[in-house]
Amino acid sequence: MEFTDLVEDRRSVHDYADADLDRETIEAILREAVYAPSSYNLQPWEFLVVGEDANRERLQEVAYGQPQVTDAPVTLVVFGRLDPAAHVDRVLADQVEKGYRDEASAAATRESIEAMREYPEAERRVWTAKSTALAAMSLMFAARERGVATCPMGGFDAEALVEEFAVPDGYEPVMLVTMGYAAEDADDETLPRKFRRPVEE
């Protein structure tokens, strides 16, 4: 699919067919999603794939009962890590090895990244959400390329989600993304596309 067609074709789908999404497809989508850009290439995202019926019901509880969480065969919880330096060793070693930086530049960059650990938590939440949202958007395009529908969701109780799924400290739930094959009569697929503000504005 041409990229323009892909962008214009993607919809936020709320009604899903009663069809499973196989592990191979999910992994292929995730492999492409992680090519998204991120601050310093630190890739702070993590993905929790929620597919078991009982677990989707638990997730629906913390998502204010929204039906698409259990209608879709899979919902991804997209997390951002609050520790900016979690992957700094591998990231900088790779950049030195491939010629993007010399050792001195890598050392200076490491110092800057490690200093970010001292930022207030609210600032680190904003930092991780920015990069993680880019990966989530890439994920939705990768899914659509394969005929898989998605819907990003910001409506959920983050604290309740962390408690319900025993999420370790340092992981911020950024969004949910439902994923599956759209129902044949899904309004989001059959009706004309919703209004978009013109670029001229």
Model-derived segments and spans:
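N-terminal amphipathic, basic helical "cap/leader" segment at the start of enzyme domains
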Residues: 1-95, 201
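C-terminal helix-cap and adjacent tail motif
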Residues: 5, 12, 174-201
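Small-aliphatic-rich amphipathic alpha-helix that forms the alpha element of a beta-alpha
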Residues: 31-35, 76, 98, 109-164
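Short Asp/Glu-rich motifs
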Residues: 52, 162-163, 170
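Short, well-ordered secondary-structure micro-motifs
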Residues: 60, 87-90, 163, 186-190
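A generic local secondary-structure boundary/capping motif
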Residues: 64-67, 140, 164-167
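A glycine-rich helix N-cap at a beta->alpha junction
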Residues: 68-83, 167-188
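Mobile, glycine-enriched helix-loop/loop "lid" segments at the mouths of ligand-binding/catalytic clefts
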Residues: 93-108
